[in-house]
Amino acid sequence: MGEITNVTEYQAIAKQKLPKMIYDYYASGAEDEWTLQENREAFARILFRPRILIDVSKIDMATTVLGFKISMPIMIAPSAMQKMAHPDGEYATARAASAAGTIMTLSSWATSSVEEVASTGPGIRFFQLYVYKDRRVVEQLVRRAERAGFKAIALTVDTPRLGRREADIKNRFVLPPFLTLKNFEGLELGKMDQASDSGLASYVAGQIDRTLSWKDVKWLQTITTLPILVKGVITAEDTRLAVENGAAGIIVSNHGARQLDYVPATISALEEVVKAARGQLPVFLDGGVRRGTDVFKALALGAAGVFIGRPVVFSLAAAGEAGVRNVLQMLRDEFELTMALSGCTSLADITRNHVITEADKLGVMPSRL
């Protein structure tokens, strides 16, 4: 293979390099994988309305997220068990994010602990949290994240049960024996037992609390001063509840299309959420972002920034830290080019008028120009 020219090319390399069980775990979605495909295809249906004859000799992509300044509105989403992809795992991802001047979100189910990731050096990091049946575990995780200098909690709210991921069932997916879920070492929650279907599905059924509700968001606010992002919101109704319950922000996410199939692509759900939020909290997006053009489209539809997941693990598998650095750089370069060719010199210049969605094509568009 010649020089890698875009983010997607890393996936084919990862597929060659990784054992089938591990590649399938990262790559697959729930059931028919309709939403998995739609997360990408929905971006392709959004077109640009570029503005011309604007001085774009200087472009500023910097932004702030929850008060933290970052170099670009492209951040790293939580992806579990990264040492399955590469021996350096989350260490490499943390270093790459820090070098790029952006945020890394560490998964609860990481194969490196919060303390280990913090030891890689300075960086703005968020901690993704699942709520366990044993609330003492949750409290302990939050305290450790605080002590390790993590700046926010990304609370995953779309996983009362694990989605039906048929590739994992076929492969009888289980965390390889040489790895553990490092944040749970010593809690007897760090290992995943072999199961007749998917070891992860059995693990979730045994540990994750299905009673999770908005009252638990309130409870979390009593045990930490860290801002709480609610990850997994795709409707206006839940957006309004997130605002009412004091969320610091929302991540529009369908869990990489790994939970409920036939939910909309996140880019399709974004505007509904943004409108319901009414500017009261920032709205972010993950799911299907593979190009700088995707980043621009998300911002034009009201996102404050995007998170990338699979591109990180695929590039990590292919080339370790250098791969993740390259993915972040390629997306940055593409996004900068898209801004220039659209006539935007800062993120504030990117407006709803820069894009045409399916709804616009049905005749809604002229009213807003």
Swiss-Prot record:
<comment type="function">
    <text>Catalyzes the oxidation of glycolate to glyoxylate, with a reduction of O2 to H2O2. Is a key enzyme in photorespiration in green plants.</text>
</comment>
<feature type="binding site">
    <location>
        <begin position="309"/>
        <end position="310"/>
    </location>
    <ligand>
        <name>FMN</name>
    </ligand>
</feature>
<dbReference type="GO" id="GO:0046718">
    <property type="term" value="P:symbiont entry into host cell"/>
</dbReference>
<dbReference type="GO" id="GO:0010181">
    <property type="term" value="F:FMN binding"/>
</dbReference>
<dbReference type="GO" id="GO:0009854">
    <property type="term" value="P:oxidative photosynthetic carbon pathway"/>
</dbReference>
<dbReference type="InterPro" id="IPR013785">
    <property type="entry name" value="Aldolase_TIM"/>
</dbReference>
<feature type="binding site">
    <location>
        <position position="25"/>
    </location>
    <ligand>
        <name>glyoxylate</name>
    </ligand>
</feature>
<keyword id="KW-0560">Oxidoreductase</keyword>
<keyword id="KW-0323">Glycolate pathway</keyword>
<feature type="binding site">
    <location>
        <begin position="78"/>
        <end position="80"/>
    </location>
    <ligand>
        <name>FMN</name>
    </ligand>
</feature>
<keyword id="KW-0576">Peroxisome</keyword>
<comment type="subunit">
    <text>Homotetramer.</text>
</comment>
<feature type="short sequence motif" description="Microbody targeting signal">
    <location>
        <begin position="367"/>
        <end position="369"/>
    </location>
</feature>
<protein>
    <recommendedName>
        <fullName>Glycolate oxidase 5</fullName>
        <ecNumber>1.1.3.15</ecNumber>
    </recommendedName>
</protein>
<feature type="binding site">
    <location>
        <position position="231"/>
    </location>
    <ligand>
        <name>FMN</name>
    </ligand>
</feature>
<comment type="similarity">
    <text>Belongs to the FMN-dependent alpha-hydroxy acid dehydrogenase family.</text>
</comment>
<dbReference type="InterPro" id="IPR008259">
    <property type="entry name" value="FMN_hydac_DH_AS"/>
</dbReference>
<dbReference type="InterPro" id="IPR012133">
    <property type="entry name" value="Alpha-hydoxy_acid_DH_FMN"/>
</dbReference>
<feature type="binding site">
    <location>
        <position position="107"/>
    </location>
    <ligand>
        <name>FMN</name>
    </ligand>
</feature>
<keyword id="KW-0285">Flavoprotein</keyword>
<comment type="pathway">
    <text>Photosynthesis; photorespiration; glycine from 2-phosphoglycolate: step 2/3.</text>
</comment>
<dbReference type="Pfam" id="PF01070">
    <property type="entry name" value="FMN_dh"/>
</dbReference>
<feature type="binding site">
    <location>
        <position position="156"/>
    </location>
    <ligand>
        <name>FMN</name>
    </ligand>
</feature>
<feature type="binding site">
    <location>
        <begin position="286"/>
        <end position="290"/>
    </location>
    <ligand>
        <name>FMN</name>
    </ligand>
</feature>
<dbReference type="GO" id="GO:0051707">
    <property type="term" value="P:response to other organism"/>
</dbReference>
<dbReference type="GO" id="GO:0010109">
    <property type="term" value="P:regulation of photosynthesis"/>
</dbReference>
<dbReference type="GO" id="GO:0003973">
    <property type="term" value="F:(S)-2-hydroxy-acid oxidase activity"/>
</dbReference>
<dbReference type="GO" id="GO:0005777">
    <property type="term" value="C:peroxisome"/>
</dbReference>
<keyword id="KW-0288">FMN</keyword>
<feature type="domain" description="FMN hydroxy acid dehydrogenase">
    <location>
        <begin position="1"/>
        <end position="360"/>
    </location>
</feature>
<feature type="binding site">
    <location>
        <position position="253"/>
    </location>
    <ligand>
        <name>FMN</name>
    </ligand>
</feature>
<feature type="binding site">
    <location>
        <position position="258"/>
    </location>
    <ligand>
        <name>glyoxylate</name>
    </ligand>
</feature>
<dbReference type="InterPro" id="IPR000262">
    <property type="entry name" value="FMN-dep_DH"/>
</dbReference>
<dbReference type="InterPro" id="IPR037396">
    <property type="entry name" value="FMN_HAD"/>
</dbReference>
<feature type="binding site">
    <location>
        <position position="130"/>
    </location>
    <ligand>
        <name>glyoxylate</name>
    </ligand>
</feature>
<feature type="active site" description="Proton acceptor">
    <location>
        <position position="255"/>
    </location>
</feature>
<feature type="binding site">
    <location>
        <position position="255"/>
    </location>
    <ligand>
        <name>glyoxylate</name>
    </ligand>
</feature>
<keyword id="KW-0601">Photorespiration</keyword>
<feature type="site" description="Involved in determining the substrate specificity of glycolate oxidase">
    <location>
        <position position="109"/>
    </location>
</feature>
<feature type="binding site">
    <location>
        <position position="165"/>
    </location>
    <ligand>
        <name>glyoxylate</name>
    </ligand>
</feature>
<feature type="binding site">
    <location>
        <begin position="128"/>
        <end position="130"/>
    </location>
    <ligand>
        <name>FMN</name>
    </ligand>
</feature>
<dbReference type="GO" id="GO:0009853">
    <property type="term" value="P:photorespiration"/>
</dbReference>
